[in-house]
From Swiss-Prot:
One of its GO terms (molecular function) is structural constituent of ribosome. GO terms for biological process: translation. The gene is rps11. It holds the Pfam family Ribosomal_S11. It comes from Buxus microphylla. Keywords: Chloroplast, Plastid, Ribonucleoprotein, Ribosomal protein, RNA-binding, rRNA-binding. This is Small ribosomal subunit protein uS11c.
Amino acid sequence: MAKPIPRIGSRKNGRIGSRKSGRRIPKGVIHVQASFNNTIVTVTDVRGRVVSWSSAGTCGFRGTRRGTPFAAQTAAGNAIRTVMDQGMQRAEVMIKGPGLGRDAALRAIRRSGLLLSFVRDVTPMPHNGCRPPKKRRV
């Protein structure tokens, strides 16, 4: 019978690499993507590695309720709560998109107690690039 091959870096040898929740993050970047159908809030560290994220869909909102301001407020609160436990005190906010959840998400971020260094609108605007899709006829 053949000898078993010893595994290098198995779970028995202990954890390799750092766990996400173990990091202390004093400063981060909060990205809010607000479309008409959903609002996604992603919290990253300064280097751009994702620490936490939430969306209106993951908070339990379905259908047209995902695009509401209340759903965006709930999603922002969920994403920020986890990073506050990891020690985040200061943040920059980048808001993208035309959705209804823009202001509600920003209001929830302000209420959370984080010190905001700046709030920037990074919505992509064409310099007359591609032709837009035809208008809807309902």
